Amino acid sequence: MTKFLDETNIIDYSNQEIQKLAMNLSTDCKTDIEIAKKCFEYVRDNINHSGDYKDNTTTCKASDVLKYKTGWCYAKSHLLASLLRANNIPTGFCYQRLSCSEYKDDIYCLHGLNAIYLKEYGWYKVDARGNKEGVNAQFNPPIEKLAFELEENEFDLPEIYEEPLEVVVQTLEKYKTYEEMINNFPDIELAKTDNKNEETNNLP
């Protein structure tokens, strides 16, 4: 579980501004649930989703997401993890493979979100990508209310990762404009669906 509290180059929660915000958000909170809710709602509501705003600033490191107040779903998950880990709440990274037809026809890509370890409930998934018409992600454990319901040919990656996927980090660091990003969203091999089914079939 300690690996879900680690600081990394991307989850750089020793940054002074992240530390300050993490402390402010946890003020007067009595439980990890209260802290997690405040951190989640801050990132969801106060950091622009780069795709929704067609922002040409692509961020990756948590401190940059906070500095520029913008990020794709992946980057927003990096900031949320930093705020929670700074408050000693284990946090991991989760992904879905979704249709990205709102940006380009007939493409699929990874969507990034978080899993938070809550003392009362265990792992709980949240999606801080930002709400808009048709998207209403909430924090109400143990009920998970994510941004998107899975449709045909979409799936969850079953793992909870300690660090962001390398393909996600590489994409965010390489492509900097809105147009570059929508033409190069991070994705995985379709064979992943077969692995997912194998893992599911092997569950006790």
Task: Describe each model-derived feature in a short phrase.
Residues M1-Y68:
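Secondary-structure boundary elements
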Residues N9, N15, N24, N46-N48, ...:
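Detector for Asparagine
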Residues N136-P204:
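A structured, mid-to-C-terminal "fold-capping" secondary-structure block
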Residues R44, K61-V65, K69, E102-D106, ...:
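Charge-rich, low-complexity amphipathic helices
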Residues D64-V65, W72-H78:
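Hydrophobic/aromatic-rich structural module bridging two neighboring secondary-structure elements via a short loop
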Residues E41, A75-L165:
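Hydrophobic/aromatic-rich core segments of domains that either
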